[in-house]
Amino acid sequence: MKFFLNTGRTIWQGEAMEAGKNLDLYVKAAGVVYINEEDMEKLGVKEGDKVKVKSEYGEVVVYVKKATERMPEGMIYIPMGPWANCVVKPDTHSTGMPTFKGYPGFYVEVEKTDEEFLDMRSLMRKKYIEAVE
């Protein structure tokens, strides 16, 4: 299914980032996608399932979390971090920060998957070390 991707900070992602990006707390806060209940039903997923999010820039496997705040149908939210970085526009405009927002029509494909979820270390190895070997 096609969804509009929104990204940004969350309280939990920020707190976990300060505690340490290699901790399970950070993985649980940033390696997720928030989806509203109606869209979860359409995708045939429940909280804790894995989905693959694909864009023209890349793809990533994340865990599903039910959106607890109002989110329109057709929109998903991935907290800012390495998992979101896999699918957002990589141009940093010399800031060192990817373009998480500010470009119209950013749609991604989302599908349920049994593929492996990559923790922080494995994700970095795949994206930045193995990619150049």
From Swiss-Prot:
SUPFAM superfamilies, per the entry: ADC-like
Entry's transmembrane regions: none
MF terms in GO: molybdopterin cofactor binding; oxidoreductase activity
Matching Gene3D superfamilies: 2.40.40.20
Pfam family, one: Molydop_binding
Domain of life from the UniProt record: Archaea
InterPro entries: Archaeal_lipid_biosynth_FwdD (IPR053637), Asp_de-COase-like_dom_sf (IPR009010), FmdC/FwdD_MopB-bd (IPR041717), Formylmethanofuran_DH_dsu (IPR012040), MoPterin_dinucl-bd_dom (IPR006657), Prok_molybdopt-oxidoreductase (IPR050123)
Protein name as annotated: Protein FwdD
Name of the gene: fwdD
